[in-house]
């Protein structure tokens, strides 16, 4: 089984990259791909860049050039669920855009034209994430809706808009729905497993800078364990 792992930023992929054996580096379309072996599995680790377009371009290249059997999206996210604290993990059951609006043409808020309203995570990968979680002491996770947009959510107005339109949202970030849409179009299963680096409020930028390393550590540990389980 070949597994694709996607993180937007260098800090979000470094821990996993350092665990790869027989690592080779490839540069395509402005993205960095690391191929190698992780916990016995063939892995392609993508550093896509930040935002929806960068993520979609990188994911499309990953899927076309390397043809993974599944995609795991790792990294950081802003917490919306009240039970989440810094370093906790979020596991996607579905992913939606929070900044898409073609409702004038009869689509749901957040639904891109000619696309499903939500991109549904693969149930086997969700169960694998929960199995990985069960093997780790003192790690808390919430599964649910993750919303994506090309904005760092740090104002009460933006937070209220997202809560009003997506009341079940547990976390927000800037790449997952674009990754999910690419996987949907290539018919490749995906799941998002990220860790909380900040809470979506006015203190978010300061929190993000301080706690990104903690989020990267938590999400990387989860993903590495998932790879081990998937390879069994």
From Swiss-Prot:
* GO molecular function annotations of the record: adenosylhomocysteine nucleosidase activity; methylthioadenosine nucleosidase activity
Q: Which InterPro entries match?
A: MTA_SAH_Nsdase, Nucleoside_phosphorylase_d, Nucleoside_phosphorylase_sf
Q: In which pathway does it act?
A: Amino-acid biosynthesis; L-methionine biosynthesis via salvage pathway; S-methyl-5-thio-alpha-D-ribose 1-phosphate from S-methyl-5'-thioadenosine (hydrolase route): step 1/2
Domain of life, per UniProt, equals Bacteria
**What keywords are annotated for this sequence in UniProt?**
Amino-acid biosynthesis, Hydrolase, Methionine biosynthesis
State the EC number(s). 3.2.2.9
Instruction: Please write the reaction equations for the catalytic activity of this protein.
Output: S-adenosyl-L-homocysteine + H2O = S-(5-deoxy-D-ribos-5-yl)-L-homocysteine + adenine; S-methyl-5'-thioadenosine + H2O = 5-(methylsulfanyl)-D-ribose + adenine; 5'-deoxyadenosine + H2O = 5-deoxy-D-ribose + adenine
Please tell me which top-level EC class this enzyme sits in.
hydrolase
Gene Ontology CC terms, in alphabetical order = cytosol
Q: Which Gene3D superfamilies match?
A: Nucleoside phosphorylase domain
Catalytic residues, chain numbering: 12, 198
- Write out the GO biological process terms: L-methionine salvage from methylthioadenosine; L-methionine salvage from S-adenosylmethionine; nucleoside catabolic process
Cite a single Pfam family from the UniProt record. PNP_UDP_1
Which residue ranges does UniProt annotate as crossing the membrane?
A: none
| Residues at which substrate binds | 78, 153, 174-175
User: Which NCBIfam families does this one have?
Assistant: MTA_SAH-Nsdase, PRK05584.1
Database matches in PANTHER family: 5'-METHYLTHIOADENOSINE/S-ADENOSYLHOMOCYSTEINE NUCLEOSIDASE, 5'-METHYLTHIOADENOSINE_S-ADENOSYLHOMOCYSTEINE NUCLEOSIDASE
Tell me the protein family, please: Belongs to the PNP/UDP phosphorylase family. MtnN subfamily.
- State the protein's purpose: Catalyzes the irreversible cleavage of the glycosidic bond in both 5'-methylthioadenosine (MTA) and S-adenosylhomocysteine (SAH/AdoHcy) to adenine and the corresponding thioribose, 5'-methylthioribose and S-ribosylhomocysteine, respectively. Also cleaves 5'-deoxyadenosine, a toxic by-product of radical S-adenosylmethionine (SAM) enzymes, into 5-deoxyribose and adenine.
**Which HAMAP family does the protein's record reference?**
Salvage_MtnN
UniProt-recorded name of the protein: 5'-methylthioadenosine/S-adenosylhomocysteine nucleosidase
Organism, by scientific name, is Photobacterium profundum (strain SS9)
